[in-house]
């Protein structure tokens, strides 16, 4: 049975863990990092993912996709997408289904498709570490993600070749990693402020049970917004000093983004930092450089309102849980932004206690996902995890009213039913409009699906009995059914296309991903073959130089011919031919090595014979001990 890996698919960085026995283990990437940047880049020749994609972003800003999680499950005309379009260097476009996608080189990619590229990279890293194929995963999402965003995440997993065994909320995963199930009857708040989202979850734990009582948050608040405030400040400072607006220069903005992120991190440990960007732009007078000092106080003044805005969801979550701040026993900080001293101060002040910083905020979510994988596979026993649905679910009723069937913060999985009737005489069918949200009117909430229940017998209004049932699984994904109680006719819908991708789309993308994985493998084999060949050529040339005239002319000529042939093949794309030619050169170089050893052996033998002859001409060899004379000594006293 293959391992179930735990993945934190983050806005800025992603992380993967796996259970080894009873302990979760972080899987590092080939670059040695414990987290991988959630960045995908397209060049003229290839697709790059992770650290290598991030490194080239400055020179390729319009084809480098970052923070794709902010577009997951969102419509193109949503206010959040409008906000992101203002700052995004890459093109955000409207997909045929109305979702927000990204366009690179004339092709439109959906957000699950880009996310799948990141997941495929994490999957490959896990397979390289484990030495076996990985097909199953637990993937985390912000607790406040709606159904469309959860489904988009699940689809991304499928495209990447992963069966997503469970979608788990990030704060819940963090509580598992913290060891909440081992605690004795505690009330815990998990404050999760990451790169793109904010969640607050209130949990009760004890006796191997982790129960989420309430959750709240903002799926469009995180480190990216903090970075943008710093970028805006730097742009304004440069404009004041030089009269040049950098906000329209995509390459300069990418450099500013990297500098802003670094400055923000530096100011978590230092009181002041310096942004030094030489040759940031140029005008008719020559190149321009940026040199700006930022203090921690200045950063806090720039982002203070963002930090304060996290307290309102905290109040709502506590109210929904029926608790007050002073009843919370422990506050756990999760997400890279919680390293910021101002965030820690605001959280400490709100809850009236020092936050717990014992867990690694960048890795704790992936660690918890791996533990959840262990629970599902049976490796981790005696832990019961009870999560909740973050948003209310219901249908549209007469007058455009949103009628809730399942209230927010209901423990999942769950099933609720309610009987409705017709609004007019002889109504032959009813249209079921499924919604998710907290607003009283349907138009203000998010549509999950629409379907019709037809074939209702003619009857006065109010007579037919239509039972509508909602079913939410452990992943927080919704199924809805409607049944005519009189005829027994039933219509149901599993809300699986809310990510914007049909089953046909997903299967097509799965095939593309598999083909790309094959291409990636071929590229890797070609690179390895070239590297091996290059190393062998270097070593062989060095050996020839060391031997000089001592090398056999025929062997030397054969080797030089084979090296020339191999160099020519290395310019091509045929890995198998390079490997064959490398083997041939290796065999020829072995002959050279044998010749070298034979010459050394002959020289050693000749030197030994001369030494023996010298010993024979000298005095006879006796026992060295015979020449040793014992000596007396006298102690001299001063």
Curated annotation (Swiss-Prot):
The keyword Chaperone applies. CDD domains: ASKHA_NBD_HSP70_DnaK-like (cd10234). InterPro entries: ATPase_NBD, Chaperone_DnaK, Heat_shock_70_CS, HSP70_C_sf, HSP70_peptide-bd_sf, Hsp_70_fam. Induction: By stress conditions e.g. heat shock. Residues 598-622 have a biased composition (Low complexity). Residues 597-638 are annotated as: Disordered. It comes from the Bacteria. The keyword Plastid does not apply. The modification Phosphothreonine is found at residue 197. Residues 627-638 have a biased composition (Acidic residues). One of its GO terms (molecular function) is unfolded protein binding. Keywords: ATP-binding, Chaperone, Nucleotide-binding, Phosphoprotein, Stress response. Signal peptide: none annotated. Belongs to the heat shock protein 70 family. NCBIfam families: PRK00290.1, PRK05183.1, prok_dnaK. Acts as a chaperone. This is Chaperone protein DnaK. It comes from Desulfovibrio desulfuricans (strain ATCC 27774 / DSM 6949 / MB). The lineage of its organism: Bacteria, Pseudomonadati, Thermodesulfobacteriota, Desulfovibrionia, Desulfovibrionales.
